[in-house]
UniProtKB/Swiss-Prot annotation:
Coiled coil: none
PANTHER family hit by this protein: RIBOSOME MATURATION FACTOR RIMM
Subcellular location: Cytoplasm
InterPro entries per the UniProt record, alphabetical: PRC-brl_dom (IPR027275), PRC_barrel-like_sf (IPR011033), RimM (IPR011961), RimM_N (IPR002676), RimM_N_sf (IPR036976), Transl_B-barrel_sf (IPR009000)
Classification lineage: Bacteria, Pseudomonadati, Campylobacterota, Epsilonproteobacteria, Campylobacterales
Subunit structure: Binds ribosomal protein uS19.
UniProt name for this protein: Ribosome maturation factor RimM
Length: 179
């Protein structure tokens, strides 16, 4: 598997107590994936970490083979990864919810006009913004290289993950024009 087959799910922080617990900073929307016996990868290594205990109330985690403070210090600042395949299995989505990794690189259209492709998703607190890299055709016409579309019904009509396409209302092109 290549690096693009994995997604960041958490960052490990400082040690907590003497038994090897470390602070877990969840980088995903799915805290349910952090449970006893769940396994995660460490970037640029083949090493996997297996959860021995997870305390959701204070976001601390104890990994097998890291059950003392000295050993646990080796984990500080590491990023945990999960395979996209396993994420799909363990993280259940509701209707009209999507994984970030499914939205990224989707082409964005307003009717038959290709506006660009999603290169990032920003959380604004109340909602999300799709960061769009403008189609070369619009850049040549002196429109901005990057613009943002709110992930709201007013702007996004339909997302087709199978075709990797997002269809927007007429207001999306207005955003591009006025960016």
């Amino acid at each position: 598997m290549s690096e693009k087959d994995f997604v960041q799910v958490a960052k490990l922080g400082k040690t907590v107590g003497l038994k090897g617990y470390v602070k877990l900073h969840n980088l995903s929307d799915f805290s349910s994936q952090f449970k006893k016996d769940a396994t995660f990868f460490i970037k640029n290594t083949k090493e996997m970490l297996k959860i021995k205990h997870y305390n959701a109330s204070n976001s601390t985690v104890l990994f097998e083979n890291y059950e003392d403070i000295e050993k646990a210090k080796e984990l500080i600042n590491l990023i945990l990864f999960q395979s996209i395949e396993k994420s799909r299995q363990t993280c259940k989505l509701k209707k009209d919810e999507f994984f970030y990794f499914d939205i990224l690189e989707c082409e964005v259209f307003e009717e038959d006009k290709r506006l660009g492709k999603v290169i990032d998703i920003l959380e604004t607190g109340a909602s999300y913004l799709f960061e769009i890299q403008s189609d070369e055709k619009w850049v040549e016409k002196k429109y901005p290289k990057i613009f943002f579309i709110p992930y709201l019904d007013k702007f996004v009509k339909n997302i087709d993950i199978e075709k990797r396409q997002i269809f927007c209302t007429q207001d999306a092109f207005l955003i591009l024009e006025n960016s």
